[in-house]
Amino acid sequence: MNEVNNSNALHRSAPLAKQRGAKHYREGGAMIRHRCFGRSISRKLAAAVMAVSLLAGQMLPVMAAEDTGNAASVKNNGASATEKEVTLRVCSWEEYIDEGGWDEDEALELDNGTTIFGENSMVEDFENWYYENYGVKVNVQYSCFGTNEDLYNMLTLGDVYDLVCPSEYMIMKLMSENKLEPLSDDFFDENNDKNYYINGVSPYIRDTFETHEINGETWSKYAAGFMFGITGILYNPEKMTADEAGTWTVLNNPKFSKQITIKDNVRDSYFAAVGALQRDKLMDTEFRAQDDYSEQLKDIMNDVSPETIAKSQDLLQDIKDNVYSFETDSGKADMITGKVVANYQWSGDAVYAMDQAEEDGVKLDFAVPEECTNLYFDGWVMLKNGIDGDADRKQAAEAFINFVSRPDNAVRNMYYIGYTSVIAGGDDDTVYSYLDYTYGAEDDEEDVVDYPLGYFFTGDNSDPDYVLRAPAEQVNRQLGAQYPSQDAIERSAVMEYFDEDATKDINQMWINIRCYNIKDVPIWAWFIVAAVIGALAGVIVYHKRSKKFYLGK
């Protein structure tokens, strides 16, 4: 079975819905809603539902038949049996889309006159919008996965979907395996006012997708972005300085022995190790001034040569001895409770942790390592075996991407899940208005800074229309994590998909680190091992000679 080795798993924890902001986070609390249940709970619920269904089926067959007819009637909304209907099978991360049901006081009244309110689920609103605009009923079957590897294994085991939302490296893997359906030419038509994605995607994100390739094909041919972020160090400023936190070398800083946590996956940990190993090179001003700096940075951070893997293994074994633990999701809670003083974290989860800690009276900050940072994203791709040449289904899939990319819907999803949309909005300033609503300084605040974000919204960081007036502290907190500065973005690199041989090598490295640290073996133990091996060899030789002597005799 062609399964992904879980030692290579990258699991960004499922985001939790929340509200925050310089203007509003001080009074806001975490609002946690669930779109999909965990697998074990889902299976138990499914079993219970099935049992009840079977019992009901035995006791009330006639009523069951009537209910089936009624359900069909409701589903079709009174439509005739001949009316066209498209089924769209979507699979995305758990808790990664607005489920609606907002309270009335949650309505977002933005300065540009837009009111954002999630009454219905995003999926339900899409179904209604699609019918109104295309005259075709669409039935969205929405499923969830917990990790990229879960999704890949689901596909390998035979699950079929039309549209999925994996992370960058899994998109690259699916591209390399020729499993993706290319986006249509119509999807990129900027004259179509329903093409919200191509008309609203951030110029920076668009350029990233159009300049990165797999096997000579750009990401943009197959993928449309959804959410993005960077990695860094979440830390307690009362226990650690910004300079101490702002480098990958903090992970093996003995001053913070057993007070830091690191990600329990090979890709994130390997990236941090390479960043620390290459610190001198990455910090060199001449290197950063080169015209092809970004390309060289990408090559360095994706170096999987035997030498780099070996050096990274040695460093990660040292880091393993220095950190409190490897973790996937517990790091946020450990920071909030004060169990640790720093945590290697994804920006989206860092924002969540800062929000939650603030409710408990704890202030946390976020530092982007000065050497470099990892740019990650999740994006929509269509699966070839799902679309299967069906033009209606492909149109519905692309329409779904466009609908969630509409600026007001991008805001709904950001508000609900807490991550950062790739949508800037183009001529529609709703996203920026939401940013100002969330992080803009109050008129009477004194300690404020100008925070330019033109690189994201227009491609020009000097654009005066996109300079946010924000509380100074937010530069190193939620604002800086959710919308990184241009300086942080310029020293970011995407960690690309590794081929089969490289994946095997770094997975073996990870096994060596997580399961066995050769440096922990004392010298005297090696002498014992050598003596035992020597003794066993002697016994084998003795028996062979004895057997030869006996046979000869």
Predicted regions and their residues:
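Ligand-binding "clamshell"
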Residues: 174-183, 217-220, 353-368, 444
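Extracytoplasmic/periplasmic substrate-binding proteins
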Residues: 321-389
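Conserved C-terminal helix/tail region of periplasmic/extracytoplasmic solute-binding proteins
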Residues: 458-553
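Bacterial N-terminal signal peptides
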Residues: 48-57
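Mature extracytoplasmic/periplasmic domains
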Residues: 382-483, 522, 533-536
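Extracytoplasmic ligand-binding site segments that recognize negatively charged/polar headgroups
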Residues: 89-105, 112-119, 169-339
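Sec-dependent signal peptide cleavage junction
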Residues: 56-75, 543
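Early extracytoplasmic/lumenal segment of secretory-pathway proteins
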Residues: 69, 74-173, 177
